[in-house]
Amino acid sequence: MVDVIKNTQIHCTYGCKSSKAVQPDVAGKMISKAKRPLFIVGSQILKDEELLKRSIEIAKKADLPVAATGHSMSGLVDQGVNAKYINVHALATYLCDPNWTGLDGKGQYDTIIVLGHFKYYIDQVLSGLKSFSKLKSIAIEREYIQNATMSFGNITPAVHIEALDELIDNL
């Protein structure tokens, strides 16, 4: 078992709602139990072939709808993933709207899973979602994402791949 929450320190002032550190097996089970999940993939998956491979495996094994942000669309389409392109800021605005019917028109999402984004970028996007929506967010990034509902801790690239493998095994 990969311990991705070891040595994770959460610093916040009084009243701050911060992300809970989560183990990969728990994250995998939560994704499986979500009624209407959305996998939001960023362009950083293209910088590492192993990360791209794991993101495709997660999407296919859990049968997740995929929102491709940045230029991540190219890597996903080449591998046969049915992804929809959308700007991450526009997506965050839509996700806060209770009347939005989703990328496929089947209704609002209840859980989002994020992978392949810059920490400083996705943390700000999730800040808005945390404050203005009831969505659960699971950050399976290499860095701890403070504004997600749950997040992996700060881990090395090798441990991150191991954690994603464990998550995939629990989908």
Swiss-Prot record:
GO terms for biological process: methanogenesis, from acetate. Belongs to the CdhB family. Part of a complex that catalyzes the reversible cleavage of acetyl-CoA, allowing growth on acetate as sole source of carbon and energy. The alpha-epsilon subcomponent functions as a carbon monoxide dehydrogenase. The precise role of the epsilon subunit is unclear; it may have a stabilizing role within the alpha(2)epsilon(2) component and/or be involved in electron transfer to FAD during a potential FAD-mediated CO oxidation. Keywords: Methanogenesis. It comes from the Archaea. This is Acetyl-CoA decarbonylase/synthase complex subunit epsilon. It comes from Methanococcoides burtonii (strain DSM 6242 / NBRC 107633 / OCM 468 / ACE-M). Coiled coil: none annotated. InterPro entries: CdhB, DHS-like_NAD/FAD-binding_dom. Heterotetramer of two alpha and two epsilon subunits. The ACDS complex is made up of alpha, epsilon, beta, gamma and delta subunits with a probable stoichiometry of (alpha(2)epsilon(2))(4)-beta(8)-(gamma(1)delta(1))(8). Pfam families: CO_dh. Pathway: One-carbon metabolism; methanogenesis from acetate.
